[in-house]
Amino acid sequence: MHDKILILDFGSQVTQLIARRVREAHVYCEIHPNDVTDEFVREFAPKGVILSGSHASTYEDHQLRAPQAVWDLGVPVLGICYGMQTMAVQLGGKVEWSDSREFGYAEVRAHGHTNLLKGIEDFATDEGHGMLKVWMSHGDKVTALPAGFKLMASTPSCPIAGMADEARGYYGVQFHPEVTHTSKGREMIERFVLEICATKADWVMRDHIAEAVEKIREQVGDEEVILGLSGGVDSSVAAALIHRAIGDQLTCVFVDHGLLRLDEGKMVMDMFAGRLHAKVVHIDASEQFLGHLTGVTDPEQKRKIIGREFVEVFQAEAKKLSNAKWLAQGTIYPDVVESGGTKTKKATTIKSHHNVGGLPETLGLKLLEPLRDLFKDEVRELGVALGLPPEMVYRHPFPGPGLGVRILGEVKRDYADLLRRADAIFIEELRKTIATEQDAAAGLCEANQVGKSWYDLTSQAFAVFLPVKSVGVMGDGRTYDYVVALRAVQTTDFMTAHWAHLPYSLLGRCSNRIINEVRGLNRVVYDVSGKPPATIEWE
């Protein structure tokens, strides 16, 4: 049985980052709403509790409080931003509205020596005070400490930016240690979880396989399972894990809608049917999908058509498998959290995979979600541990509608053929081009990134087909061919993104190869838009 940390969510946009930091310390944790019952908290039996931030005001919203059981358990508690404020109020301190709000970067001075911040600092002042570079986002502030607490940190505009009751293991910080802008934040969360809560760092994916396999076998018994295999990371890892558990009781259905990446169908079949010896039904439905997309230019309409056709094709195939009692999905933990589907009284909706939404009810199948407790990086780690090739597990995200939303306007087979070849060249060049010291000196990458491929240094990269023609010259002849745009971004969370500053030499090779090797294209452009204002995908 793993030690557990309970994270109570008060509505912060970055609560998932808290959980990721805890998991990165190899400690299991779960996010649950702040209004869970005392009974739930006691039954969860955490080794420690973390209270998240919130957009709410502590003194205006008296409903957003931690359950009393949190304070009765006798385990350490860390309050972050709003979490610190509700800790103060619930334990007898005072919180007031501040006319000097703090949003963004700040420097916090540590006071005294506390178990949480001992030895953790970004720099020291001439007077010897330890200073921390942090990220603030608050309007209210604690103005009176609860009994038993001492001052732990401050800023000029927030005299109580941190507080500690060492005897009970209660700590509050007004800043956000979970975000990357707080440079020592990861160390603080690790200190709280590993040392103050005294948890065992035993949440390791390689060890998780045995537990997951046993759980799947207990759930499924001798019944059969079907899974929609897309070639994406989540469905691929789910398929490999379920196959490890129940072998031929799993049937994967791989639908080729004609909008996949170059050789993707072959790669999926080679991996699952060839290497893992899994049962895979390969359906070429490209004519059906492309036929229904004829004349359609609206992006949302294209998505709906592709989703609808997938459901029809998958449903028809699933009905042939009369012995199947389970539908497996690659749902991961962020999907569960965002849909309110955590393991509490609020677990009313499950965010279905975009391709199979509604299918469990339609087909009368039970739902199997073996990855629902894992974050994306944990899913990738699990995939490698299961023997999937890293180039499959660490592929960039690919939209469910595939190239259908990377072809602007109407989708045609010819357009898809041109795009997938251009996209493959771009990805190939990114994979084989290694970041150099010259790239670092030019500010294109960090010094510690030298030696990595530019594919690994970008979060997502792809080509976009533009249905416009431009004039060009090839040899002695004039051409009038199509244009492709290359897009590469760097991001930590995909909520915001910077366009990747790729070396000109790399972009030049991509352009030369695409124009020379893909007949029908004569111009290549590079997208230098960030998110916001642009989105990562064009449609």
From Swiss-Prot:
Protein name as it appears in the record: GMP synthase [glutamine-hydrolyzing]
Active site per database record: C81 (nucleophile), H176, E178
SUPFAM superfamilies assigned to the protein according to its UniProt record, in alphabetical order: Adenine nucleotide alpha hydrolases-like, Class I glutamine amidotransferase-like, GMP synthetase C-terminal dimerisation domain
InterPro entries per UniProt: Class_I_gatase-like, GATASE, GMP_synth_C, GMP_synth_GATase, GMP_synthase, GMPS_ATP_PPase_dom, NAD/GMP_synthase, Rossmann-like_a/b/a_fold
Any GO molecular function: GMP synthase activity
Gene that produces this protein: guaA
PANTHER family (UniProt xref): GMP SYNTHASE [GLUTAMINE-HYDROLYZING] (PTHR11922:SF2), GMP SYNTHASE-RELATED (PTHR11922)
Annotated ranges, domain GMPS ATP-PPase: 203-395
PROSITE patterns, alphabetized: GATASE_TYPE_1, GMPS_ATP_PPASE
Source organism, top-level taxon: Bacteria
Organism this protein belongs to: Cupriavidus metallidurans (strain ATCC 43123 / DSM 2839 / NBRC 102507 / CH34)
